[in-house]
């Protein structure tokens, strides 16, 4: 005489509950906490009614979103350091040109494109990354890092146009000074932003 597992339906249900309980408990932990403190650009892209949500674009689960976020931010950090190094080299070329070595003009122009492209790729990885697991309103190194990103992003957008303006401007010295000042502020904000990523708070 065979024994059917249905005779032990209470046991079967108990096993199901034990199996599902960790999954049920883990789900709320993966939900975005304190959404009201989410950065504006993240809300616009990944909020409940964000652009990517409307397109049904991206990973299907929060767990996969968080994995993608980690990968994107890791690559963002690597490219950001490369961008910082390239910008330092660009600044060096610029100061040498200011001293009269115009033989570096071609290198300065070529590396400006490489630097700009690397920076924008790095910035895109950060701005387009899925939301974090938790947000808060306290001051932290990462929040200052984000504020500084607005400064050096604006600088990187402006520097190429200010460089071209040197050639066409009626006041060469003034145009050159403006270009260098914006480039210096951009480099300083990027450097400080990079340092903040290594702080534990």
Identify the function of each model-found stretch.
Residues 166-186:
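Predominantly the C-terminal beta-signal and adjacent terminal strand-loop region
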Residues 104-117, 142, 175-182:
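Short, charged, amphipathic alpha-helical segments
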């Amino acid at each position: 005489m065979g024994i059917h597992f249905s005779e032990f339906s209470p046991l079967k249900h108990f096993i199901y509950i034990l199996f599902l309980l960790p999954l049920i408990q883990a789900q709320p932990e993966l939900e975005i906490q304190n959404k009201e403190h989410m950065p504006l650009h993240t809300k616009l892209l990944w909020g409940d009614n964000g652009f990517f949500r409307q397109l049904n674009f991206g990973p299907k689960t929060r767990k996969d979103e968080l994995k993608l976020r980690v990968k994107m931010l890791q690559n963002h950090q690597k490219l950001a350091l490369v961008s910082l190094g390239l910008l330092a080299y660009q600044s060096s070329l610029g100061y040498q040109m200011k001293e009269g070595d115009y033989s570096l003009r071609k290198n300065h122009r070529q590396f400006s494109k490489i630097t700009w492209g690397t920076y924008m790729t790095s910035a895109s990885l950060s701005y387009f990354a899925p939301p974090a697991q938790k947000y808060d309103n306290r001051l932290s190194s990462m929040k200052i890092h984000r504020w500084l990103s607005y400064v050096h992003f604006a600088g990187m957008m402006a520097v190429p146009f200010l460089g071209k303006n040197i050639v066409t401007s009626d006041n060469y010295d003034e145009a050159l000074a403006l270009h260098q000042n914006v480039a210096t502020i951009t480099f300083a904000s990027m450097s400080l932003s990079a340092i903040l990523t290594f702080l534990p708070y």
